[in-house]
């Protein structure tokens, strides 16, 4: 039995974590086994890598170092959490996955997309999400929400141009593969966003039950 792999993507302040929890609750209420996780992170080792990636520091991190750390955490996450859960037929809901790598390291940092694709194949093989929800909103709105949460991490401290490139990368990927991506307007009130998620539930339940 093969499970269902759902990823949630979008820029800072888009409400991914809140809506990840909401979607998981709705699926669990229907008797579906759900594994909630996040990237970078998801295992004790990968969470330590996350701390290195997100913590501001005196030494500037080289973009290639950043990219390799992201995929190192992902390799551990896949081996310990994602692949075993999918193998037993669970629904895996992950807050960020490889689309964020293309958006942040590819779009924001300007790294080679071909290099990212090579690492993607090396680490993931042919594993790709079955469905990706992209929570889109204007950059300035997302950054204001992130600032309101309190202390900013290393990525949240980046400027407008960085996040403009990140948003463009997400939208470009969603437009190129509409059968996998579902775009949501995250600038709406939360209740409206969750109504859009509810509209997906019948399809998700059908796929989760095989």
UniProtKB/Swiss-Prot annotation:
Keywords: ATP-binding, Kinase, Nucleotide biosynthesis, Nucleotide-binding, Transferase. GO terms for molecular function: ATP binding; dTMP kinase activity. Its EC number is 2.7.4.9. One of its GO terms (biological process) is dTTP biosynthetic process. ATP binds at residues 10-17. One of its GO terms (cellular component) is cytosol. Gene3D superfamilies: P-loop containing nucleotide triphosphate hydrolases. It catalyses: dTMP + ATP = dTDP + ADP. InterPro entries: P-loop_NTPase, Thymidylate_kin-like_dom, Thymidylate_kin_CS, Thymidylate_kinase. Pfam families: Thymidylate_kin. Phosphorylation of dTMP to form dTDP in both de novo and salvage pathways of dTTP synthesis. NCBIfam families: DTMP_kinase (TIGR00041). Belongs to the thymidylate kinase family. This is Thymidylate kinase. It comes from Pseudomonas fluorescens (strain SBW25).
């Amino acid at each position: 039995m093969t499970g269902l792999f759902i990823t949630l993507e979008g820029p800072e302040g888009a409400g991914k974590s809140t809506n990840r929890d909401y979607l998981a609750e709705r699926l669990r209420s229907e008797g579906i086994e759900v594994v909630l996780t996040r990237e970078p992170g998801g295992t004790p080792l990968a969470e330590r890598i996350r701390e290195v990636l997100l913590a501001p520091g005196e030494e500037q991190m080289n973009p290639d170092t950043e990219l390799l750390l992201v995929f190192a955490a992902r390799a551990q996450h896949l081996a310990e959490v994602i692949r075993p859960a999918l193998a037993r037929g669970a629904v895996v809901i992950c807050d960020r996955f490889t689309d964020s790598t293309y958006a942040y390291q590819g779009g924001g940092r300007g790294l080679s997309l071909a290099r990212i694709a090579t690492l993607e194949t090396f680490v993931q093989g042919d594993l790709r999400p079955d469905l990706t929800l992209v929570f889109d909103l204007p950059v300035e709105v997302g950054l204001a929400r992130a600032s309101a949460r309190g202390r900013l991490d290393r990525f949240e401290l980046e400027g407008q141009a960085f996040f403009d490139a990140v948003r463009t990368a997400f939208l470009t990927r969603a437009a190129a593969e509409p059968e996998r991506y579902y775009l949501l307007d995250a600038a709406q009130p939360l209740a409206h966003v969750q109504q859009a998620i509810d509209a997906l539930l019948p399809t998700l339940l059908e796929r989760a039950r095989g």
